[in-house]
Amino acid sequence: MNSKILSVAMAAVFCTFNATAQQAPTADQVVSALEKLSGVHPGERRNHILGICVGGSFVGTKDVQAFTRSALFSGATIPVIGRFSLAGGNPKAPDATKNPRGLALQFKLPGNSIHHFTMLNVPVFGAATPQTFYNALLSNMADPATGKPDPEKQKQFRETHPDAKPLGEFMAKNNPPVSYANIDFFSIHTFKFINANNQTTLVRWHFVPEDGVKRLTDAEMGTMPARFLDDDLIAKTKKGPVRWNMMLTIGQDSDVQTNPTIYWPAERKTIQAGVLTLTSATLQKGADCEKINFDPLVMADGIAPTDDPILQFRSPSYAASFVKRLTGN
């Protein structure tokens, strides 16, 4: 895939550049770089600006209680507010843009506890560290002299950041979906499930659409209406529920915990962990999901984060963007 798609894809799932060692970026620096890359749109998200709100429920599989005491897997019906999104900060980007898609879920657990899942439709992230992510954004900044990214800076980024390669390879081989109902979503990061005996298990998860994964052809990408994904999901949920199966991959102690650019071995055990059912879809302006900050570190008892530096960095970055939205900036 070309370097612009790679850089925007990475920006779009979370920004001049030099290849020497640098101090780790702050959350404010990353948000400012996102603004410089895509412009400032007051009151809106700095990344994943385009989205649609959804509502429904989740029913977890009781068998998962062997691994976690989380109320998500009690077998009860858990109310869900969610948001599908298109990665990037351009409010005019068409839905056929070859960027990652996001699915953020807020689960309302018994006792008024809240738990968030914040997923992407790619199995790996485009950076192992916040520095790589930041450098990717900077490498795609427009050169003032040309109004376009500098090819030499982009080339330098690719040559000096091998952790960006797995996402680039995946994006090059996979077109956008025909429908939000036909996308699978990945946890990206590794998490810890903690059971009633305080035993910890490493896990990743994957939401698989009941109707299967279906992608646009190259020809279709050039003919689809700008907001076809939103329109399609609204129409589908009016006709009936749309579902995903949550598949849980059970890790081993030797598996990578802190690098979201590395795949786990394909032979790891996978079990069904629950079913997500969506029954409504609404344009996001003024809807329930619009003001939610889907911080992936908002977790209830029984699930905990790893020390993945990207996962840990997402929380302050989301907060910095959220504050700007709340203040109308």
Q: Where would I find each of the regions flagged by the language model?
A:
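Active-site-adjacent core segments of small-molecule enzymes
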Residues: 22-329
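Gram-negative bacterial Sec-dependent N-terminal signal peptides
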Residues: 1-21
